[in-house]
Amino acid sequence: MIPNWAEERHSMVATQLAGRGIFDCRVLRALSEIPREQFVPLDVRIQAYADAPLGIGFGQTISQPYMTALMAERLCLDGSETVLEVGAGCGYAAAVLAMLAARVVAIELIPALADLARENLRRTGRGENVQVIAGDGCLGWEELAPYGAISVAAAAPEIPAALVRQLGDPGRLVMPVGGDGDQELRLVTKLDGHIDTSVATHCRFVPLRGGQKRR
């Protein structure tokens, strides 16, 4: 039997998000409207709204809904920003950010996943203000910097200097930092030339990879 996806989304928002401290109404609305099931592979579609990350191929994952919501909420977007997303994956988080910001620049290292993200965004009607670029997210995307916010969906031992440099002032960046077994979701805030860093939560993400030319 085909699930009632609208009910699945409503339940996910109520229990996994609002029930765990996500209070930003715009973030909750975005995740209640975007059809997550249309962004995941067919073989895991039945689990689209599970409280867990799901494989999307090439050793990559789509984050659990709570983590997508938490990262978006911590960016405190007001709708005027250009957001840089590193690790576009299947395009789902970019779709969420696109409902919260003026423009999203989403970088994906794996060309086939960049193509998938573009197609998913096009097919679901969520790509009008999203530009997907196949390239090395560790380098950011200098051409459109500075960014009002940066979201990184892969972990590294430290935050790449290029991303901090491309973060606007004021600006906020969220990224998991650490190794395979111990990662922290860090929030970097830049204001009046000062940079502050805090820890939002512990987490577990795939590693941030680099070394591929942009296209």
Where are these regions (language model features)?
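Class I SAM-dependent transferase core
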Residues: 1-84, 92-95, 100, 113-124, ...
